[in-house]
């Protein structure tokens, strides 16, 4: 009989505890589209640098 109040209190505490479903975003949670855009931009920069060394007329002047 003494355990019943303790059991009820524990149940109330567990029910009022915050949920662990919410997770913070980490730096690894980058959207895939953003990753592809970064890769495309980096490859374009490298291509432009290489092209400018071989043929200066194909350089993009922004």
From Swiss-Prot:
The keyword Disulfide bond applies. It comes from the Eukaryota. GO terms for molecular function: toxin activity. The keyword Signal applies. Keywords: Cleavage on pair of basic residues, Disulfide bond, Gamma-carboxyglutamic acid, Secreted, Signal, Toxin. Belongs to the conotoxin T superfamily. This is Conotoxin mr5.4a.
């Amino acid at each position: 009989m003494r355990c019943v109040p303790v059991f009820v209190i524990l149940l109330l505490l567990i029910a009022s505890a915050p949920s662990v479903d919410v997770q913070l975003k980490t730096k690894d949670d980058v959207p895939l589209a953003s990753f592809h855009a970064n890769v495309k931009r980096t490859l374009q920069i490298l291509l432009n640098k290489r092209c400018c060394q071989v043929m200066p007329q194909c350089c993009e002047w922004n």
